[in-house]
Amino acid sequence: MEKEILYQFISMELVQFATFEDCYVENDEDIEITNKFQFSYNFVENVMCCTSSVSLSKESRILLKADLASYFGIEPSSAESLKESEDFIAPPELLAQFASLTYGSIRGVIFAKTMGTALNNIILPPNDVRNLFQTSQRFKRT
């Protein structure tokens, strides 16, 4: 990042978690992993939320769905330095950092919540998210 951005990992919220163990069949078919990231910004609190959504499926049957929201408080002077007019501009490095922290957290949540089930044998692999974020994201004050 060009300028140092100070932030604090404030909290996490498990928005959704569901398993469908009856759809799991032990065979040589690959498990498909889908993940996406969504961001929002609270201008009043200087808080950015990164939500990671993960879905695991096998042979077109959903095995697991999870959404984890992570909240990051951005230090006021850092937040001001990222504002352009009334908008907040999140650089790609910051988006990648928050996505990486959230994805790592959801990996742990999935492991912990599937303990004692057949799905615990499925380890969500690491994901280098840096290449997903090449441009800044603009958040408009509403």
Where do the protein language model's features map onto the residues?
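N-terminal intrinsically disordered, cationic/polar leader segments
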Residues: 1-101, 108-142
